[in-house]
Each structure stands twice: as C-alpha cells, then as structure tokens.
Amino acid sequence: GKQLLPGGLILQWLKIPSSAAVKAVTLDNGNYQLSGYKWPQSFGVLFAVFATKVSGATNEAYAISVNHNSTDVTVTWNARKADDVHILGIGKL
C-alpha cells in the first residue's frame, strides 16, 4: 500500500508472503534472494527502506535492494525462511 503525507512525502509498504520463499534463488554465497516484487509507485527520492519478518517476539532484518525512480524490490536473506517479510519505504515522489 501507500500513503501520501504532508510535504510531498510518501510512505509505501508491501508484504511478501511466506509461501513465496519456495521461489527464492540461491546465490553463490549460499544466501537466498527474491525479486519480482514492486512498490505501488516509484520514489523520486528514497530516504529509508527496511525489510523485516515478525514472528512472535523475534524481529529479523533483511538486506533489501531498491532504487529511486523504480518500483522494483529485491530481498536477500541467509536462510530459507517460512515467514512473511514486511517491507517499508519512505521518500518523496
């Protein structure tokens, strides 16, 4: 989803379901990577982005790759997980 905020800020989020883990590509270093996910709208300026799973009382951050002027989102992690991944980004249009 997305939410426009005062001052031209935009907050966007998406959830990659746990069922998507089976589509992850194994990298040479043994990590797993999922791509093919997209923001609702591209950021003109990207201030911060964060990806995490929330499972009980445990939060775990993941490496994430996004660029301004693109809607593409790629997430990398070090073990095949069966948890939903939540991604949040903030920036300007």
Where are the model-predicted features located?
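Short acidic-hydrophobic surface loop/beta-edge motif
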Residues: 1-6
